[in-house]
Structures are given as structure tokens and as C-alpha cells.
Swiss-Prot record:
The keyword Acetylation applies. Disulfide bonds: none annotated. The modification N-acetylalanine is found at A2. The keyword Acetylation applies. GO terms for cellular component: nucleus. This is Protein FAM50B. Keywords: Acetylation. Pfam families: XAP5.
Amino acid sequence: MAQYKGTMREAGRAMHLLKKREKQREQMEVLKQRIAEETILKSQVDKKFSAHYDAVEAELKSSTVGLVTLNDMKARQEALIRERERQLAKRQQLEEQRLQQERLREQEHRRERKRKISCLSFALDDLDDQADAAEARRAGNLGKNPDVDTSFLPDRDREEEENRLREELRQEWEAQREKVKDEEMEVTFSYWDGSGHRRTVRVRKGNTVQQFLKKALQGQRKDFLELRSAGVEQLMFIKEDLILPHYHTFYDFIIAKARGKSRPLFNFDVHDDVRLLSDATMEKDESHAGKVVLRSWYEKNKHIFPASRWEAYDPEKKWDKYTIR
């Protein structure tokens, strides 16, 4: 076996050149063979054409004895031509099969030569190159360890499954939220003009404070002269000493467990009354009735109790420490 003295890179380049030259030589041989076959086929067609009719003429002469009619002569001639064409077709088929077998043997021969070329090895006498080759073989033998945790690697199937589950949970949560927002609740309030006038209004938990005030205003206009010309934007809703913005929904306060100065803004659980237990450390969760007031009244009386204690609602502000008075 041939030996090659040089670096691994030069050995690879030499192998590449050998394969390239072998491929070019094979292409040239195929081209030459194709040209030769076409030339032979053309000459054979011409020869077969003339030989075919010569043989038919000779056969017709030998088989015709004495006088025959023109129709008999034509019938014999046509029969001989058909028989001769059948024989030529069979002979051509056998010739094509032989050529096909030769091509298959040639292809097998080429594959064998390619295999032998790919099996060529080069003996490298350089110790560094030998070490590199050994290292490359060791690296090539490395495989995947089935015990290694690959959960942190990207996985399209796993990501699609997680996205599907996440979307299902989101839709389930949305449906549950809409169901809660559609539930009705009863809001107790007092129209406050210095004294309380308690009323109740039923609204959905998804309604805004403004929608609640609109309902409250419709029920109070007939009883209070100053409300007949008032609009919703002129009203304020105070709950647990906090002025609630018009754009917030009751659902927002309930889901966030929003608190006023002394207790939750909206809580539907029943707890013991702290006044009965005489324990100032226990919260009484029953919320007070809210107050609906005209903004003009508040501006005139905000320095007087109870308006002096009212503050704008701030979701970031905590009221955990308080005393019940």
C-alpha cells in the first residue's frame, strides 16, 4: 500500500485530488462510450435496413416457384417482411440486454474502484500528527449520554406542548374571570348631603364605579332636587374613607382584596363583630355602606368631618395598622 509523508491537511488535499481526477476520468470514459455506441447504432441501422430487404427478396425468390398471381405475391412478401421484422426485433432486444448487462458490470467495477480509493490510508511518521489523529478518533467515538439532563435545551415539541397548555390555562382563566364579572352583587350606599339616606343597588361585579353611580343617580333624582340636573361625572363614591375612581370595576377591588382605612372595601364573608368580642386587635370585615356625594358638596365641606378624612384611592398604599374608633 502506498505511503504518504506529510501533514494531515496535505493528506486530505491529496485524497481530494485523487477523487477529483478519478471522477473526471470516469466522466470522459462514459462520454467516449456514448459516442461510440451512437456511431455503431447508426451504422447498424443502415446495414440492417439494406440487409433486411435483401434477405426478404432472397426468401421471396426461393419460395416462389412457377406462375403466381399478383395478390399471392404481395401476401407472401408481406408475410416474409413481418417474420423478418419479428426476428430483427428479437435480435435487437437480445443485443440491448447484453449492453445493459455490460453497463451494470461497468458500474459495479466503478463502485469497486471508488471503494478501494476511499480505503487508502497514509502512514504518518510525524508524532504530532499521530497524536492529532488519535485525538480525532477518540472524539469521533464520543456519543450522547442518555443520563444527561437535556430539559434546558431547546425542544420544539416540548415548547409547542407548553404553549398549548399555557393557552388552555389562559382561556380557562379568562372564562372563569368573565363568569365572576357577570355575577350580581348588592351595593349598599347612602346619598350624603350632611346626613345619610341609605339605598341599595344591584350591579354586576364587572361594572365600573361610574356605571354604579349612573344607576344610583337614576333612583335618587326623584327624591332629591339637587340631583335632578346633576350628571354622573358630578358624583363621587366614597368607601371606607377612600374616594374611588370612576374607571375602576368592583371586580378590580374584589380580586385585589383592596382595603380601606379600617377594613376591606368589599368583602362578602361573615365574621364575628369586633364590638361584641371587645377585641380591638381583630378586624371586622363587614364593610360600611359607601357614600354617594356631589363633588360640589365635597369641595365646600372637605375641611369638616367626615369629608376631612377622605382620601383618593391609591392601590399601592397599605392600611394594615389602624385603630377602630
